[in-house]
Amino acid sequence: MERSEVWFPINYLILEALKRYHFFYGDDLKVECPTGSGVLKNLREVAHELSRRLIRIFLPDSAGRRPCHGNDNLYASDPYWKNLILFYEYFHGDTGRGCGANHQTGWTGLVARLIITEARYASQ
């Protein structure tokens, strides 16, 4: 089954909502995350798990490939291009490959806020 596209503004709003619901429900409300794992997490933990997944779209793997650039070798191997990160309009739900316009620094730039939030969360 193919997943639908990943849009940063919608995902960001979902993350914020999960954190607010956790503020209200605390550890009394837990859901399975990831689905099918049998692992129960509170909503704050789920928000951070989803946030880390969104951040990974931009991180290089062991071969230097970033999911946001798909299979384009230019961005993985060329020394002049490998550190260029494009902020696509939306992303493929299964692969993380960037789709649509690649100059969406506005809403896709929310990844910077996610990185800051995750760094703070990890240091607690």
Regions found by a protein language model. Name each.
Residues M1-Q124:
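Acidic, mature catalytic/reactive cores of soluble proteins
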